[in-house]
Amino acid sequence: MRYMKYSIIIPVYNCKEYLCECVNSILTQNADCDFEILLVDDGSSDGSGELCDSLSKENDSVKSFHKINGGAASARNYGIEKSTGEYLMFIDGDDTLSQGALEQFAETINDSLCDMIVYGMSFDYYHKGTITHQELLSCQINGVKEKSKIFGSFKRYFEDNTLSSACNKVFRSAIIKENQIRFVEGMTLYEDFNFVLNYLAYSEKIFFIDQPYYHYRIDVDHQHLHNRVSNLEKLQSNLELLLSSMLDLSSQTESDEMLSVGADLYISLLDLNLLYSNESIENKRESILAYCNSNVFAEILERGAQPHPRYKELFSRISSGQINDLQKEYRKRRLKMNARKKIKRIIQKVRK
């Protein structure tokens, strides 16, 4: 087997409780390849930075770096600059990698000479430190695919949810560094997806593995979706960056499906904002209209995007000024949603 080296970049921010498990899941891999683990402490205040130094002293494969807090994208970009491996991987500090992963990746690269590996994920839901359930996210296909095939059926790959994360992938370092592909700092939503799309622009062969090697930790006690979608202006700026990447890539691939996926994302997140935001729809009328009148979104539609009928209807109703009617409908949806949550909590207490 051809010798290869991985650089595994781990942004670290206040995850001291989980970091050892994350690092050990890599160090205990039984693989005939070399790797370096780059721990990039992003200004932690819980002792994670000191733990990074300790882990580095214990094992020569672990390198510790410290920087001023700038977010996960900034920490990953820092890791890219410091990396020396032929292949790059990104793992979050509270997640883990299954045994056999690196060995499988090495065999796949050796046999296929692909530009990127995409593998499955396990979403592990924790409540008070215990896994309550797992949601397996496996690629529906197994084997190598040309880039043109992926963009010809882009919606299918997006709905599999295998393209949107940077964590369930192996990248060629040369493609990233030679083309200056980086995570957009300040982008807090779909920054991984944006990075992957920019990488795909310079790739040809992608290998899919249906095994869920990546374990993504989700603490159900700290999941607040409404916080991520409540600021409409920030939501718009993030999604416009993603749509711009899609527009650039569609010029190469002629993928109308990708543009339609982008349009659906744009309107669906407006839908979530209207549902979860505590601010009344009437009070943010101007922000909603500005969101709908985005020049980037308009270009997506002009280039052939076909949004889902439900999202298309929402966009149409806002454009025609039906703000008050929408406010009543979303108020009813929120009441129903909150009622279901209360019933669920009561049932859980009874079962205990």
Regions found by a protein language model. Give the residues of each.
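Short, well-formed alpha-helical segments that are part of the catalytic scaffolds
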Residues: N14-T28
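Short aromatic/hydrophobic "clamp" motif used to bind/position activated sugar donors
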Residues: L88
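Membrane-interface aromatic/basic loop that binds lipid-linked glycans or pyrophosphate carriers
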Residues: Y276-K352
